[in-house]
Each structure stands twice: as C-alpha cells, then as structure tokens.
Amino acid sequence: SRIGPGLVVLLGVSRADGSGQARKVADRIHKLRIFGDDEGRMNEALGDREVLCVSQFTLYADTTSGNRPGYREAEPGETAEPLYEEVCELLGARRGVFGADMEVEITGDGPVTITLEV
C-alpha cells in the first residue's frame, strides 16, 4: 500500500489491551494536533490526510535482560489481529498484511515519531 501526506501508524497490541481500546486509539489519532499549520507549528489534526497502518508486535519488546528481546507483553496474533483490523477500519487506513514480514519505506516530514498509549 502507498499513501500521500498523512500518518504511518506502527500499531502494537499488548496483552493489557481490550476490545474497547480500538475506538480510543482511533479517536486519539484523529484528534492529535501533530501536523504543521501555515506558520509551521504543530496545530492541525489528521483531517483528510491518509493513514497507513502496519502491525508491529515488536513495540512491546522487553529488553531488560539478556541479548534477545522477549515479547510476552505482546498480544498473540490470533487475538491481536481483530483489534488491529478494527483500528484500521475506524481510521479508514490502508494497511499492511497483519503479521507478515514486509519492507516498509517511510519518508518522514520532520521527522516526528510519537508513542501513543491509551
């Protein structure tokens, strides 16, 4: 998938996330004022811009011990996928293939990277 100006959402689902999280996440993403206005200040929300969602369980990597990350905080794929799909639907997002190895090319404006926990 390819998008024009907008957001790339790397979406991880944790074991603590429940079914109500999808709407909270999508609402938060829609309302975040992270796009530049006419003066270059982060003052505009998503609006009509496009969204690309990529599933990213590695966001919940535990690197506190050893040399190999653990992923016990990440929700297993079979239960994470429905929440991922719901967030994508609510955002009207294009998406990558859930759980697949993909080559993702991101051209950032800024760049700006924001971690959002709800």
Tell me what each language-model feature is.
Residues 66-74:
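Short hinge/gating elements
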Residues 1-66, 78, 82-118:
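N-terminal, polar/charged subdomain of small-to-medium soluble alpha/beta proteins
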